[in-house]
Amino acid sequence: VLDASDYGMVGMLAIFSAIASTIQESGFTAALTNQKEIKHEDYNAVFWFSSLTGVLFYLILFFCAPLIAEFYDKPELIGLSRIVFLGFLFGGFGIASNAYLFKTLMVKERAKIDIVSLICSGFIGVTLSLNGFAYYGLAVQTITYIGIGSLLKFIYAPWKPTFQIDLHPLKLMFSFSSKLILTNIFTQISNNI
């Protein structure tokens, strides 16, 4: 159904996705987990930061899609990358909820989320691939996994964001998370080049 070139098309975008996702998460999940006392404002700041950076990265990469396609000399990457990069929009909404689930040891809930996301996205990806959508099936599978996972994390986590946008708590977490960002970016670059 899928051949190596289909995986290669999606794989070409992996470096962009990996670096942008690392910056979007910014090590704040680990920073929240590391804090002894976490307030609503801390989770809220991470939620708004990751959501807004998700929108920003999607817009940047959406408009850079022709440049990415030109770099690889693959015009098909324009449409494909614009679909794959939707993961930033969906993923940003689940980062703070995921940190809450992790911090409060809601392991059973996280396992359910992963299983449901995997089964649903796998079904959709296989169905699309069997119907001739090739690498688009892989792309939709990926964003479906991210989207369902983010939605379920939001549902399962008792914490909910509010519209009181205050990014000040991020400054306090940044001393811890900044080291993780750099390490993770270098790791992603070395793994994807």
For each feature predicted by the language model, list its residue ranges.
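Interhelical loop/hinge segments that connect adjacent transmembrane helices in multipass membrane
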Residues: K108, K112, L151-N192
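Alpha-helical transmembrane segments of multi-pass membrane proteins
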Residues: I19-A20, L59, F63, K74-Y100, ...
